[in-house]
Amino acid sequence: MKFKHPALLLFIAGVVHCANAHAYTFDASMLGDAAKGVDMSLFNQGVQQPGTYRVDVMVNGKRVDTRDVVFKLEKDGQGTPVLAPCLTVSQLSRYGVKTEDYPQLWKAAKTPDECADLTAIPQAKAVLDINNQQLQLSIPQVALRPEFKGIAPEALWDDGIPAFLMNYSARTTQTDYKMDMERRDNSSWVQLQPGINIGAWRVRNATSWQRSGQLSGKWQAAYTYAERGLYSLKSRLTLGQKTSQGEIFDSVPFTGVMLASDDNMVPYSERQFAPVVRGIARTQARVEVKQNGYTIYNTTVAPGPFALRELSVTDSSGDLHVTVWEADGSTQMFVVPYQTPAIALHQGYLKYSLLAGRYRSSDSATDKAQIAQATLMYGLPWNLTAYGGIQSATHYQAALLGLGGSLGRWGSLSVDGSDTHSQRQGEAVQQGASWRLRYSNQLAATGTNFFLTRWQYASQGYNTLSDVLDSYRHDGNRLWSWRENLQPSSRTTLMLSQSWGRHLGNLSLTGSRTDWRNRPGHDDSYGLSWGTSIGGGSLSLNWNQNRTLWRNGAHRKENITSLWFSMPLRCWTGNNVSASWQMTSPSHGGQTQQVGVNGEAFSQQLDWEVRQSYRADAPPGGGNNSALHLAWNGAYGLLGGDYSYSRAMRQMGVNIAGGIVIHHHGVTLGQPLQGSVALVEAPGASGVPVGGWPGVKTDFRGDTTVGNLSVYQENTVSLDPSQLPDDAEVTQTDVRVVPTEGAVVEAKFHTRIGARALMTLKREDGSAIPFGAQVIVNGQDGSADLVDTDSQVYLTGLADKGELTVKWGAQQCRVNYHLPAHKGIASLYQMSGLCR
């Protein structure tokens, strides 16, 4: 009986591996002529061929490493041959083994870089799982160091490669107004985010340029800093311009040095709350978001409700000031409260921050006063947390003490009090005090998230550090407004989200109220959003209200309500196309209705949308507006454009965005880099999709970038094997990486580039090559291929001509080959080789 597929050997190996509880005997005579010279003893005893295998190293079922491991043929205590891995003492230590408790590990290893004797650990076992390419290490728990759950072992943390990287984004818009006085407005916005990685050090900068109308362009640097992780301290060291943490005091922009705990290095069951900016645009509008005086986000949105989730906020508090620049020249301004949740730490956990430097205001005319800050939080018994801090600066001192606690299923609560001593420019010394209560609860069972913060200002002289330092200016001008002179008496912010499942939808509520001292009235801001899925479509209702106190004691109040519905048209179009309708109704009139069709094409690389809207109270002929939007997600970046037209105005806009990484292999262009980045390397495999992201493909060298990796956790980077070129094969389609904060880590795929061939081998005397013989392509890295029962071997990555080495037992021979002129079926060469 003849076997046509070289996969037979792998099948036998799999049977042997899976049947380790039973004894199987393989009869060599069943292989026919191919049995000559075949030693089946290793197969009969369930053992693979010795050699080097690339495997995932698993300790008690958890991956701790991926590497090439040398396996040697040894005998166990019963004299049975086994494959034993060569692992060094230093490797075992990195895998979490308490090597210092087992001196016998060093019996065979004179240095930490030689093979250790794993039998020195009682009941420890090492098994090669050839089917899954895993080395399974079974280590008793008493021989392992305690480990944190939720993050990868520290031995796997990868600081990445030296690299220069930069994000870029730009947008330009031209608006022509046709009614009354004809005029043209041009606005442009550019943001650059360059960075350098050297070892654990990260150097980062964010610089933006903005021009609007007739005003000249203005550059603004949001920050420039260098930082690195101090892993033994579970902390980060920052030098330069950044913003202080906002868990105890309000966030403060500074230039100086900061040493602070890094929560990402220590797993929490819950991560820090991330804000979402929700609003409603009456027209196609530009939305600008500022935090602590700096522009952190700038984009264009379609008419109707919007939700901005990609905000690069500081990891701290600070309200988000949102401005919506409508196409008709009007503006909306509102504030999204953003505060950190209540403080509640696990018992024994210490969290700290130390800061010294100069105050860095967004206004360049503000004096750069010296500042210092220290904060400390510590988890006490009985689910309590004590915390406190001090702030000191020219003309300002503050101290804060607080106590927080975990209430179990009822959430977390913290209360603190602060005392300040300050003097604004040109004013007398003031003393003040405030109390703050924070409550947060996240109920996974009911899908509820709730955050509440209440400030009570006990006296009129209370000021924050920014209030005081912003009053000192070196240009001689004192900026004053009647609102700056108002003293708040209390402030409350609320954030609530509730999920009711697929059919009832999701509800979110945000709100804030500020009461003023010695003046009646208050400022209010509320937002309500509800959305659900209906028959494959989506329905959402949004409402926003902003109520602002004016100088004369009156209030300016504006409500906006929006209803939106979307329905897929798949059953008619056969692809990803949807139709939508939305109605936007401001309280001061100007109700707008809009219908649109949007979809995707070219494997989701092209996004397109066509809209038609009507505004009821617009001037004659100006109520109808037509709009077109296109966006291309390319391998080398993002490109978008939009066009809208009505009898009153015409607007055109173009935007681009992308990321650049310069590394030891050259320059790689890709889509914008977010967070830690994987540099995918699949040499010779160009145009292969990576990670399932639209448009993310390898370039002409086989390189690309994938961002948004989870830091200090295992991430899987995948190639789409169905899109590989005909002359390319990969030995694995998944690579796992564990990046540190801001790292550029290599995700290397082992590729074989060249021809594929099925070669029949013969010896000089005409006899067949034995079954199971190893065939190595000389000059090619990677594992050997195996000869099947027909003396055939499947080879990949072949050059036009070359040499093969064939080994079996103690014998070997060589084959010189030259590819035929024509390929066979499935682009596979059929050829013969004489082994000498």
Question: What do the predicted segments below correspond to?
Answer:
Residues 463-465, 487-760, 766-778:
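Exposed, low-structure sequence patches enriched in small/polar residues
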Residues 171-179, 208-214, 242-248, 357-363, ...:
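Sequence/structural signature of outer-membrane beta-barrel proteins
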Residues 157, 186-199, 219-233, 368-382, ...:
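Feature captures outer-membrane beta-barrel proteins of Gram-negative bacteria and organelles
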Residues 2-12, 16-271, 581, 586-661:
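Post-signal-peptide, soluble extracytosolic/periplasmic N-terminal scaffold domains
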Residues 78-87, 311-317, 703-729, 741, ...:
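Short Pro-Gly-centered beta-turn/loop motif in secreted/extracellular proteins
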Residues 49-58, 62-73, 684-693, 765-780:
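Short, ordered, surface-exposed loop/turn motifs in non-cytosolic proteins
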